[in-house]
Design a protein with these regions (language model features):
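Conserved hydrophobic/aromatic beta-strand scaffold that supports enzyme active sites
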Residues: 134, 145, 154-156, 286
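Flexible glycine-/small-residue-enriched beta->alpha junction loops
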Residues: 76, 141-144, 148-151
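Contiguous, glycine/small-aliphatic-enriched amphipathic segments in soluble metabolic enzymes
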Residues: 1-131, 172-258, 262-293, 298-322
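Glycine/threonine-rich beta-strand-loop-alpha-helix active-site module
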Residues: 123-145
Length: 322
């Protein structure tokens, strides 16, 4: 039996809806996709792309290109591609929460999400720092954000924080939690029995023996020693400026970075189009695109669907593993 996956386009004024319409043009044998979206927005996206889309009841299977089962999420106002409206923030959140709730109840087996515009949601009066954090709160469990492409996987100890707040967020608990969740997910979801995890230092040159900061000596190294005693294969702390050299990456299954812009620029440079965002630690797989809403491209039919295609294929594989 094929896994059922929610397909949540994200910001309706961005490229998410048209990417979902493009995805529906492809017959697939790995999953049953159900869009959690506004039907009028999907029809508008299809019209802008000169494509057809036939919206079905959620339980109906897609049998032909253009078929897309739909769990309708009604927006407050009509979509204008390229011009987001904070009045639709509640609909964006409703789509995410509705899909997550159906995963937690067992009705669905995973979620694929498109790009969300954080500022628009906050302007709509809904405090929101990211979908990863929202899904973790709803599931009541700690999670880790991992981004991956064909070349490298990068997991993050901290996610969407101002740079001045990062050092205070690097604690023994946050580092250990990230490493345990990452190791368990690599074993369970990716079939790596003994994953080798490279851990970056926080400071330049991984602290230079305390001369450029003490977080490595006081926090990171003691955590690594403790977790090595529990059987985890951890390498580091490594200087971030050389850890991503190809000859070094060949010896790692993933890299754990201390903060967002420490690890992700390298990943995106090495293969942005195929990169995906995976939430580790949830009781179901969630995979997202690794790009933004691209408002300047919305409705023009030129947005690249590669990341959404990769996210959907990976989510289907993870869901099939159970």
């Amino acid at each position: 039996m094929l896994p059922s996956l929610a397909l949540v386009p994200g910001e309706p004024a961005g490229i998410g809806p048209e990417l979902c319409v493009r995805l529906a043009q492809r017959s697939r044998s790995d999953a049953h996709l159900i869009a959690y979206a506004d039907p009028d927005t999907l029809h508008s996206a299809a019209k802008a792309l000169c494509l057809s889309v036939r919206l079905l009841d959620p339980d109906q299977p897609a049998r032909a290109p253009g078929d897309l089962p739909l769990h309708p999420i009604r927006q407050a106002v009509a979509t204008r591609f390229g011009t987001p409206d904070p009045a639709n923030a509640a609909a964006v959140i409703a789509g995410l929460r509705g899909a997550a709730g159906d995963c937690l109840s067992g009705k669905l087996q995973g979620i694929v999400t498109g790009p969300v515009h954080k500022a628009v949601i906050n302007a709509g009066g809904i405090p929101y720092s990211g979908t990863t954090e929202l899904l973790a709160e709803q599931a009541g469990c700690p999670v880790v954000m991992m981004l991956a492409n064909a070349i490298v996987r990068v997991a993050l100890v901290t996610t969407h924080l101002p740079l001045r707040a990062v050092a205070d967020a690097i604690t023994a608990d946050t580092v250990a939690r990230c490493l345990r969740i990452t190791a368990a997910a690599l074993q369970r979801d990716f079939g790596l029995e003994h994953p080798r995890i490279a851990v970056l230092g926080l400071n330049p040159h991984a602290g230079e023996d305390g001369h450029l900061g003490r977080e490595e000596l006081d926090i990171i190294i003691p955590v690594l020693e403790q977790l090595r005693g529990e059987g985890l294969q951890l390498i580091g702390p490594l200087p971030a400026d050389t850890a991503f050299l190809p000859q070094k990456l060949a010896g790692f299954d993933t890299v754990v970075a201390m903060y967002h812009d420490q690890g992700l620029p390298v990943l995106k440079y090495s293969g942005f189009e195929q990169a995906v965002n995976i939430t580790l630690g949830l009781p179901y797989p969630r995979v997202a695109v690794d790009h933004g809403t691209a408002l300047e491209l919305a409705g023009r039919g030129i947005a690249d669907p590669s990341s959404l295609m990769a996210a959907t294929a990976l989510c289907a594989r993870l869901a099939a593993r159970g």
